[in-house]
Amino acid sequence: MYKLRADGYSRAIAGESSGGICAFNAAWIMPEHFSRVHSAVGSFTSIQWHPENKQEGGDIYPFRVRKDPKRNIRVWMSDGSDDLENQFGSWPMQNIEMANSLKLREYDFHFRFGTAAHGGAQATLDLPESLAWLWRGYDPAKTSEEFTIDPVEKGKPFFRVTIANRDVW
């Protein structure tokens, strides 16, 4: 029998693509069970949006982060400029919007944005650093900690988009 900790402070959850939004969703709904989130190429898009059933999609999360009560979670996100664009939305744009929402509410978060496509390549490269970042300062004698935005991140501007494949005026 394994002896696992029951407190959210001692638990993390991770996922890639739909698993990335699932990991965030689990921590968002149950921060007392999961306080650390790794989301790689998270599908914060409208895949599950079904208006006839009044079912929201993941595209609503940036707005929920901005308007719902703040959760005590620490979040690592990564995505790339070559990620998916399809009928469900734009993975790069939605991840940028999520990062800006987390920043606006002063969550303890890190956003890595590169040139990767949809898949595990970036997540594989990031995993050692993301785990070290998510677990920094962990004290097994504690069962909770108030996560706050890193002062360096707080001093940085919001993420902005530059259009590189079209003429601009």
Go through the PLM ranges and name each one.
Residues 1-169:
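Non-catalytic cap/lid and distal C-terminal segments of serine-dependent acyl enzymes
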